[in-house]
Amino acid sequence: MEAGGDNAVPAPGGVEDLVDTQFPREEAGDSERVHASTLDPGDGDPEDTGSKDQPSSLLSPLPQTEAASSTCEHWETAAASDSSPPGEPESNSEGQGEDPDDGGDPSDEDWRSQRKHVFVLSEAGKPIYSRYGSVEALSATMGVMTALVSFVQSAGDAIRAIYAEDHKLVFLQQGPLLLVAVSRTPQSAAQLRGELLAVHAQIVSTLTRASVARIFAHKQNYDLRRLLAGSERTLDRLLDSVEQDPGALLLGAVRCVPLARPLRDALGTLLRRCTAPGLALSVLAVGGRLITVAQERNVLAECRLDPADLQLLLDWVGAPAFAAGEAWAPVCLPRFNPDGFFYAYVARLDSMPVCLLLLGTNREAFHAMAACRRLVEDGMHNLGALRTLGEAANFSNGPAASAPAYSVQAVGAPGLRHFLYKPLDIPEQHRQLPQFTSPELEAPYSREEERQRLSDLYHRLHARLHSTSRPLRLIYHVAEKETLLAWVTSKFELYTCLSPLVTKAGAILVVTKLLRWVRKEEDRLFIRYPPKYSTPPSTSADQAPNNGLFTGL
C-alpha cells in the first residue's frame, strides 16, 4: 500500500503529519509489490535519486537514450552460444574479479543464475573486470556489449539501458572505459548506474582518470588488469556491500560510530593538534564507520571532502592488506581531483580495529606521519578512547567485522526490526558531511539471504520515493514477512522495517518512538557539529580556488 503523490499526502514535516495521514485502500493483489503496478523503467535518473543534499552533478551522465528490449534478447542469445571454453581461475595478480566457485563460461548454469553481473571493459572491448567468472571466457560476451555501444554511437546517440522482462542492462561510458550492469534485482536503472559510478571511482582511486586516458590513448587494446592487480577483491567487496548493507550508497552518506559527543570532540581536537608537512586530512575509523575527521585549511583551501570520497577511503582502509601494521600508498580521490594522488598513511592503533588514516601531499612524509600516529595513539590512551571503542566493537556481530553498532532494542519500540535514518536538517556549514545511522542487523536478518531480501526492499522503496515520473513522500508497504514504512521530509529520510503483525496505528506509534529516540541520541549517533575546519584562506575575485593541487606521482 502506498500513500503518495501530490493529492495523497501533504508535505510532511513531523510525527503529527504522519498521524493525520489517511492511507488509501489498496486492492487485493500481490503483497510483495510496493505498488500495484510495476515500477516505471525510467524511474530515478542519477540526478534525481541521490540524497536531498547531494549535488546533482555528482551522478549526472551524458545525455543518452534507451535501446529497445529486443537488443537484450540478442545479447542473451550471443552469450548463451559463446563456445569459448571455461577459463581457468587466475590469481589475484592477474586481475580476476571472480569467485573461484563460479564458472566462467556464459553458458554455465551457475554463472547465469547470478542475480547481478558487473562488467568493466575498454572501448576496444578488452576485458578488465567481471564480478563473476573468468574475463577470458567472457571476452566474446563483452565484445557483444562493445558492438551494441558502437552501433548506437554510430547514429550519434549513446545507449543508457535495455529492459527485457525481468532483466535490466545498464551502460555507463566513462572516458575510455565502459561499465555494464546486467541485473534482475529490484534495483532501478539509476541505482545500478550509481553502483557503476562507484566501481569506476574505485578504479580511478588506484590509477587516476588522467593515467587511464593516457594509457588508452597510447594503446587502445592495453590490458588494464596489469595495473589493477589486487584491486579486484576490493571491487568484489564493494558490490557485495550493496547486497548486504546498502545504506551508504543508497543514501549518499557515511555511517558514524555511536559515540558520546565529549569523547568525539576530544578526538577531533587531538587530530587537529597532530600535524605533519603536507598533511591534508586526518580520519579515525573502525569497521568501515567514521569516528571523526579533521581537515587542514592550508592544504585543501576552500575544497571540501565529498561523502563519496570519504566512503571510498573507509572501504579502502577496510581491505585485508591494512589489517595489521602500517602502510604507505598513493590514493586518488575522484570527486576531489580525479587526476592526482594523495599519499596515504594507514595504521591500526594498539592492535585494535581502530584505524588512523592520514592523507598528505608529500611523498617523503612517511616518518612524519608515523610520528603523528604515535601522538594520536598516546592521546587516545589518555582519553580512554581505545578501551571504549574496543568494548563497542566486541558487541558487533554484523557483516562488517569489528564495527561498533547498537541493537534495535535500544530504541524501545516493540515491533521495530531495522531502520535507515538520514538527517537532512544539517547546519548549512556542515552539509559536506551527510550521515546516516542504522542498527545492527539481527534476527530474522542474521542470514545472508534474509539480508539480501531486506536490501531489495529498501532499494525498491528508495526507487519509488525518488522516482522522476511519480515521486512519493510516504510509502506504507505490507509484505509477506514484514511491514515497511518509508518517509522523506525536509528534515529526514527514513526507511523502517517492522513486524508483519504491526497495524497502521502501531506503525505510526513505532515511528513516533523512533524519531523521538533519534532526536534524543543525535549527538551520539551523528557528528552534528563536526570538528571545525580552519577557516579557508580568502581568495580574490579573480583567483578561483585550486582543486588540482596534486598532479600525480
From Swiss-Prot:
Residues annotated as region Disordered? 1-111, 534-553
Q: Which segments show compositional bias classed as Polar residues? A: 52-72, 541-553
The answer to whether keyword Acetylation applies is yes
- Positions of post-translational Phosphoserine modification: S57
Supply one GO CC term from the record.
Answer: Mon1-Ccz1 complex
Keyword Ligase: yes or no? Answer: no
Q: Where is the composition biased (Basic and acidic residues)?
A: 23-35
Q: Which residues carry this modification: N-acetylmethionine?
A: M1
What's this protein's name? Vacuolar fusion protein MON1 homolog B
Q: The organism's lineage? A: Eukaryota, Metazoa, Chordata, Craniata, Vertebrata
**Gene that codes for this?**
Mon1b
